[in-house]
Amino acid sequence: MTKTRLAAEDRIAWVRVASCYLPLATPISDAKVLTGRQKPMTEIAILFAEIETADGHQGLGFSYSKRAGGPGQFAHAKEIAPALIGEDPSDIARLWDKLAWAGASVGRSGLSTQAIGAFDVALWDLKAKRA
């Protein structure tokens, strides 16, 4: 007889984050560029978060940053990722709060929430695949 663990008993075993840049074929300009406040956007930084549970369930999430913040977003994600290890991947709202508190000194907006967003999408992906 095979024993199957309940989803609530499964735990996050590992988390991986990666970042890459998507170059734009044509730089994008807007009013901020026309007024001289910013340069044209030439690339988009994409943050990926991959989560796997002890039972082998996987979720993949992403977030992005335009013009600035990509390296900071990645650094923040790397710093808070270990807070997910050993946690119940189904308790997504609680994990959002835990990650927000893990990086509270950075703030609760901008690159902080963009970094958390990649984990959030990965957790929802994992939950959907498990359903």
Where are these regions (language model features)?
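Intrinsically disordered, low-complexity boundary segments flanking structured domains
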Residues: M1-L6, P82-G86
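Structured beta-strand/loop patches that form or line metal/cofactor-binding pockets in enzymes
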Residues: T2-S65
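Metal- or metallocofactor-binding catalytic centers and their adjacent structured scaffolds
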Residues: W14, E52-A131
